[in-house]
Amino acid sequence: YDLTPAYDLLNTSLHMQGLENSRMALDLFKNEGDFATPFFEANGFYGTVDFMEFAKRIGVVEKRAARFIKLTIDSVPAMEEMLEKSFLSEKGKAEYKKSIQDRAKALSL
């Protein structure tokens, strides 16, 4: 047997009743009390500046973190192509695609 390239990916937001608008399972800065970047305070969701701050705090080189974020945004068409080949219902595919696009847009802001 071979595992699929995305065997560990699961968009839990499609399955969590009442949490449909939650973009992440965990807060990036949970142990930081009331810490929030200006971007998060203004928008209510994480964007590139938040992930860059998180990367800095855990010791990821800035250039590497920026490259990974760009790779993630650039991979959206491949994600959508893989999604179309999935066995999700058409409704599930549409919800998943919207989720991918919303998250990519947040990273692009």
Task: Enumerate the predicted regions with their spans.
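Anionic ligand-binding catalytic core segments
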Residues: 1-109
